Amino acid sequence: MSDNRLDTARRHSLFLARQLDNGKLKPEIFLPMLDKVLTEADFQAFADWGEIRAEENEEELARQLRELRRYVVSQIIVRDINRISDLNEVTRTITLFADFAVNTALDFAYAYYRDMYGTPIGRYTKSPQHLSVVAMGKAGGYELNVSSDIDLIFVYPESGDTDGRRERGNQEFFTKVGQKLIALLNDITADGQVFRVDMRLRPDGDSGALVLSETALEQYLITQGREWERYAWCKGRVVTPYPNDIKALVRPFVFRKYLDYGAYEAMRKLHRQISSEVSKKGMADNIKLGAGGIREVEFIAQIFQMIRGGQMRALQLKGTQETLKKLAELGIMLSEHVETLLAAYRFLRDVEHRLQYWDDQQTQTLPTSPEQRQLLAESMGFDSYSAFSDGLNVHRNKVNQLFNEILSEPEEQTQDNSEWQWAWQDKPDEEGRRCRLKAHGFDAETVAARLDQIRHGHKYRHLSAHAQPRFDAVVPLFVQAAAAQSNPTDTLMRLLDFLENISRRSAYLAFLNEHPQTLAQLAQIMGQSSWVAAYLNKYPILLDELISAQLLDTAFDWQALAAALSDDLKACGGDTEAQMDTLRRFQHAQVFRLAVQDLAGLWTVESLSDQLSALADTILAAALLCAWADMPKKHRDTPQFAVVGYGKLGGKELGYASDLDLVYLYDDPHPDAGDVYSRLARRLTNWLSAATGAGSLYETDLRLRPNGDAGFLAHSIAAFEKYQRENAWTWEHQSLTRARFICGTSEIQTAFDRIRTEILTAERDQTALAGEIIEMREKMFPTHPPADSNVKYARGGVVDVEFIVQYLILAHARQYPQLLDNYGNIALLNISADCGLIDKTLAGQSRTAYRFYRRQQHNTKLRDAAKTEVTGELLAHYGNVRKLWREVFGEEAATV
């Protein structure tokens, strides 16, 4: 067989050279293989597997599988050594072959024993039963090496018996099937071996049953599953086509419902065990298990899966490379770190394959002979082994450095920190503690009493053996962090409330122990804002955001965020509760991120409202799709439906706790459309406002729809237009000035924009309009007195600015259509001045006043600012707005 590719490859593989020299590879079969990526179709075409199964020719099946392996492995070697293929092709090809071999052997074994004993039948379902094979480890992640063994677990659906004359229990039947499957692949014959089969990852290992029912597997995982088995099952993949519930029952074992920072210590323990074995056996040259090796890259990917996979289904992946890429995409790891790990992983796996190509041995140890070393270096593109070794060490050092950064032991308490232990003692020196607390600016009596209350309280005394030491380690650090704030007592009280609240979740305590660098940041945030402190108490899962690379990144790409949210929702697989929780976690994370940035002074009030409004838009669009998909009895795939935002949402002036003023519209001639879209409106509202285990999203207000609470939940666009033209009150047209299309069908958006424009530009009697708006303002006084301390309802306050702008739009948009654009009140005052409708000086002063009011409202909410103090500055702002009011309306509203 003459081919330059073969000549190149055989220098680097004794195994390939033997196959070629012994005539084991027929040119007419092998050479065409070199020009393509092998698929299952190629494996199927290699032999008449159906005939072999029909004839129950076990010897022929074993021979053909082994011969096929010889061709597959040889093809992989030639293509890889000649750099025709890449790592992904290599690992996927051998994994696909493993899947094929397992299924082919299983089909044979099942048919063999079915003919002997009959078909296994489920005791409860009365349906035929099949064996599911779970590939673990590299086989599960499509990451097999050419000389890998395969880790398998056998699971069948339920107990029962076969229906043949020689009846057997399902357990016995599937045990026999499993044994024959193993023999077909694992036995060494004159033709070699297909795969070494390792069954030790099954429950109870070698001492456990070879096969388990799904119920037995679930019970084992719940009652006896160990931490290392979580990591093993993370890559578990069912490779057989038969119906099963394995994924559903394994998922909650692998991926915990809450952030699992306890996984750090479990992973460290596993790594220490491996490192100890490596050290004892002198395996420093092992590129898999040694420092900076393949296993450390895998551990880095898996630790984040273990911690966050229960919350982020997008992380419930099998492959190491795809997991690392997703970590970068989600902002959990820095992109440059992920690129470093991916480059190292590919390099190390390429080396691993070349070590195994040499003689088809499962080895990860670098060679010692000069000849083999030089060949290895050349196959990796280096001139010398020394240069190769340098390149290898660069990758290993980078991996090990990142591994140590991520999985190193928590920082030891420094001497500086240990000095604060006096604050948290079982039997404290009361007088000494009070003096020290006072010296650090605390209200000593208040803080000492709170610390004692916690130590002797029910929650602390009932902490687990794991949780209490973690709690004890955090308290002195909290005291130290609070002492650095301008309001140490308030800060510490909030921190201690938070600590007590999260103490029942040991994982959160583990987070604080694992990331002590976040404590100062946490204290600063809580010291600045009781609202943020309460938000964290309500959603402690947001602790995780403190270590996000995106926490202070103000570049919100809402299109990319919406796409990521969509992926997460799809990963829920139609699980409504999981989707609702996903929406809530996404929204809470973005709100918290914005609040932290806001406290850091990175946003103006207007810009922040733009971001909060964009967040609400994103949530509404995603929730609409989910609510429709969740709808029973619908008559079309895509709803002809839209959501319109009014009020603060429509005007893009949302605050952290604003509710959403919504109107639902549809445009669908179907006779059941009214009923269908009313149900959709009700369902969507529930998606937004319902409290789930992950919390809530928004309070909604639907009273601005036609006819208010007495009206339908959803209106046809025709009915909406008719109402606006014939029945709407002036105040409803005022509301329409701030309305905007949020999400839904583009045809409805076009129709709504047309209707809004036509209504707002309708010819009006300006005197009558002004009188109605003044009357509307007067009606507010009994329920909202115009006190100077209330910037919203005071004369010259927020409401007056809004009414002025609404009047200007309704009175003049017909002549000045630029007033129709929903830019917000500040911009519209400027536009009105440019149109000559109001005095430019008064417009500028009113813009300044409106900004001042919004800052006051915002700071009262976020920064614990006192209720508005009536100062000369505030009164001057009121005065300027009142001047503008009088210029526009000619008179002020009279107090009733």
UniProtKB/Swiss-Prot annotation:
GO CC terms: cytosol
Single annotated GO MF: [glutamine synthetase]-adenylyl-L-tyrosine phosphorylase activity
Region ranges (Adenylyl transferase): 417-896
Pfam families: GlnD_UR_UTase, GlnE
Gene3D superfamilies documented for this protein: 1.20.120.1510, Beta Polymerase, domain 2, Nucleotidyltransferases domain 2
Disulphide-bridged cysteine pairs: none
SUPFAM superfamilies xref list: Nucleotidyltransferase, Nucleotidyltransferase substrate binding subunit/domain
This protein's UniProt keywords: ATP-binding, Magnesium, Multifunctional enzyme, Nucleotide-binding, Nucleotidyltransferase, Transferase
Example GO BP: regulation of glutamine family amino acid metabolic process
Region Adenylyl removase, annotated ranges: 1-411
Co-factor(s): Mg(2+)
EC number annotated for this UniProt entry: 2.7.7.89, 2.7.7.42
Domain of life where this protein originates: Bacteria
PANTHER family: BIFUNCTIONAL GLUTAMINE SYNTHETASE ADENYLYLTRANSFERASE_ADENYLYL-REMOVING ENZYME (PTHR30621:SF0), GLUTAMINE SYNTHETASE ADENYLYLTRANSFERASE (PTHR30621)
Family assignment from sequence similarity: Belongs to the GlnE family.
Full protein name: Bifunctional glutamine synthetase adenylyltransferase/adenylyl-removing enzyme
